[in-house]
């Protein structure tokens, strides 16, 4: 029966066994008392170590902020429970990350404004001086972890809450010095307000704006607009703080810089350089220094960045006006070939090389090379000929704008309605200004004078083998 404990009841109880149990009972009681005393002694040593660590933390917490940066204490507390060696990592001071860590560690818990003010005032007032012990030395019952170990000796197996915030305190309640001391977490985190701007070096601690808190907003000088605010996971915060203290500052939300809209510039308006890139963008107005060509409509102001590539002395120089009575002839950047042909047909002075046949919308190129030459002048292509012009006209066959009349040479016809044709060719009844040979005349200053030749005499060839052939001009060839 020696193997039975006092909690087990044997099947038969005899006098000898009862006497033996009576003799063994004090031994078991002494054994349990010894175990309890050892457990209490171990707990007291553990709590005493934590108390000493707490005093060390409280003394180091009074060091100015620009000295070093501390690792949050709950990390050290968890290390103390598991018996791992405690190391406080010292890193260069970063006020932005420290302020953001103080803000971010409080994010998962929702406090009213008054409660946070209470923690600020009480924790700030109870700070002892640097290098001095508090008036009431912490006892095993006053350590931050002691309330977790009063229930039973096996309280280490109970789940420990993440944060032990006394959120049940009313805002108007004051905490005396002799009562339960404020947790050292509040001494470091809640006594320093989270400022949206870093404090000035000359500003004293009492002069900073107190109780200014931000739950989830990052440290930016202006509130973000239109961004969703999310509370961060404490597990993620714990991992980032264990890994690196520099990663405690959460990145601010992505701010997309928007440039002020310049109403004098339209993104769909092609630049003047693109218009004159292939020398096709000659404007139809006599003053070619105004405006740019684009789809939506003309710009009704003088654009001094538009440079016309060629200016001839035959052009009539006009002062550019700020506003015009009507828009110039502008269709998709340049004059198209079918519009050029309509403009030639609309001018009766061109009837000697192009004219209507009188059968609907048919017209005939009486002198196709002259038409091609004028089209080359319009497009600044001196090598233009009828072969190239006819290849360009085939493009309009596919588009359904014109057709070649079968059986007749140099005869074409427009297949669209006449009113629609002229309305598209001449928008707002503005006739295009076509280039003529007057713009291509040769300036006398650009030629070399032949003053050393005498036009009155006849030049004879050096060899007299053949008779000269006089001409009317007096030259001999």
Curated annotation (Swiss-Prot):
Transmembrane found in the keyword field: no
Molecular function GO labels: DNA-binding transcription activator activity, RNA polymerase II-specific; DNA-binding transcription factor activity; DNA-binding transcription factor activity, RNA polymerase II-specific; RNA polymerase II cis-regulatory region sequence-specific DNA binding; sequence-specific double-stranded DNA binding
GO biological process terms held by the UniProt record: axon guidance; cell differentiation; mechanosensory behavior; muscle organ development; peripheral nervous system neuron development; positive regulation of transcription by RNA polymerase II; regulation of transcription by RNA polymerase II; transcription by RNA polymerase II
UniProt crosslink position (Glycyl lysine isopeptide (Lys-Gly) (interchain with G-Cter in SUMO2)): 317
Record PROSITE patterns: ETS_DOMAIN_1 (PS00345), ETS_DOMAIN_2 (PS00346), ETS_DOMAIN_3 (PS50061)
Similarity comment: family membership: Belongs to the ETS family.
Function: Transcriptional activator that binds to DNA sequences containing the consensus pentanucleotide 5'-CGGA[AT]-3'. Required for olfactory dopaminergic neuron differentiation; may directly activate expression of tyrosine hydroxylase (TH).
Protein name: ETS translocation variant 1
Organism: Homo sapiens
Gene assigned in the entry: ETV1
């Amino acid at each position: 029966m020696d193997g039975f404990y006092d909690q087990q009841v044997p099947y038969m109880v005899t006098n000898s066994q009862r006497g033996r149990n009576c003799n063994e009972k004090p031994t078991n009681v002494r054994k349990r008392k010894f175990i309890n005393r050892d457990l209490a002694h171990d707990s007291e040593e553990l709590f005493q170590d934590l108390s000493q660590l707490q005093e060390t933390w409280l003394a180091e917490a009074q060091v100015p902020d620009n000295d070093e940066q501390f690792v949050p204490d709950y990390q050290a507390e968890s290390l103390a429970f598991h018996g791992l060696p405690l190391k406080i990592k010292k890193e260069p001071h970063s006020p932005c990350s420290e302020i953001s860590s103080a803000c971010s560690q409080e994010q998962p818990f929702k406090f009213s404004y008054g409660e946070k003010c209470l923690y600020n005032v009480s924790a700030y007032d109870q700070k002892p001086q640097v290098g001095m012990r508090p008036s009431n030395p912490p006892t095993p019952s006053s350590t931050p972890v002691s309330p977790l170990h009063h229930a039973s000796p096996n309280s280490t197996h109970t789940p420990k809450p993440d944060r032990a915030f006394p959120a049940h305190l009313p805002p108007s309640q004051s905490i005396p010095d002799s009562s339960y001391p404020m947790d050292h977490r509040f001494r470091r985190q809640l006594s320093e307000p989270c400022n949206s701007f870093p404090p000035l070096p000359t500003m004293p601690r009492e002069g900073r704006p107190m109780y200014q808190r931000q739950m989830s907003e990052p440290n930016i000088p202006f509130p973000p607009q239109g961004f969703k605010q999310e509370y961060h996971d404490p597990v993620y915060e714990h991992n980032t703080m264990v890994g690196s203290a520099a990663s405690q500052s959460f990145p601010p939300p992505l701010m997309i810089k928007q440039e002020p809209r310049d109403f004098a510039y339209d993104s769909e308006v092609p630049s003047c350089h693109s218009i004159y890139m292939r020398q096709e963008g000659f404007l139809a107005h006599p003053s070619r220094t105004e405006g740019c060509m684009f789809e939506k409509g003309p710009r009704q102001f003088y654009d001094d960045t538009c440079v016309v590539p060629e200016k001839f002395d035959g052009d009539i120089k006009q002062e550019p006006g700020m506003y015009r009575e009507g828009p110039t002839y502008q269709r998709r950047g340049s004059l198209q070939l079918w519009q050029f042909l309509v403009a030639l047909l609309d001018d009766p002075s061109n009837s000697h090389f192009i004219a209507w046949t009188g059968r609907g919308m048919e017209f005939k190129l009486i002198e196709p090379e002259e038409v091609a030459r004028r089209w080359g002048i319009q497009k600044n292509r001196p090598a233009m000929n009828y072969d190239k012009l006819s290849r360009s006209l085939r493009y309009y066959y596919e588009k359904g704008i014109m057709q070649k009349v079968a059986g007749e040479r140099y005869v074409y016809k427009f297949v669209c309605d006449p009113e629609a044709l002229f309305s598209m060719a001449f928008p707002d009844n503005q006739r295009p200004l076509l280039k003529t040979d007057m713009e291509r005349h040769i300036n006398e200053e650009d030629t070399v004078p032949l003053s050393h030749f005498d036009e009155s005499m006849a030049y004879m060839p050096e060899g007299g083998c053949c008779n000269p052939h006089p001409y009317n001009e007096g030259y001999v060839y």
